[in-house]
Amino acid sequence: MSEQYSNDFKLNAAMAAIVLSGGVIGYAKSKSMPSLIAGSVFGLLYSTSAYYLSQGNSKVGLGVSVLASSLLGGVMGKKAIATSKPIPIILATGSAFTLLSSGKELYNIHKN
C-alpha cells in the first residue's frame, strides 16, 4: 500500500466499521431493516474503497470513497437537519470529512 494513501485507507476502514456496526445496532435495538440494509451497503462501499486503496489502486479506491461519502452525507445530512439526533449528525460529519479527504486526494491524482 502506498504510504501516501494510508490515512485514506484507515479512514475508509474506520467508516466501514462504524457504518456497519451502526446498522447492526439499529436493527438490534428497534428491528429497523432500513438501518441494517443501509449499514451493510455503505459498510460494503467503504470496505471496497479500503480494499482498493490497500492494493494500490488509488483511483478506484478514492472514487468509491467519494461516492459512498456523497451518498451517506446527503442521506444523513437531511436526517440530521430534520431530527437533530446525534447519530445522523455524527455520520453526516464523518462522511463529510471522508469526502473532503478522499476528494482532495482524487483531485490531486487527476490534476497531475
Curated annotation (Swiss-Prot):
Gene Ontology terms: cellular component: mitochondrial membrane
Gene3D superfamilies: Transmembrane protein 14-like
Keywords tagged on the record: Membrane, Transmembrane, Transmembrane helix
Gene Ontology BP annotations: regulation of heme biosynthetic process
TM ranges: 9-26, 36-53, 60-77, 87-109
Superkingdom field: Eukaryota
Family: Belongs to the TMEM14 family.
Record's protein name: Transmembrane protein 14 homolog
Taxonomic placement: Eukaryota, Amoebozoa, Evosea, Eumycetozoa, Dictyostelia
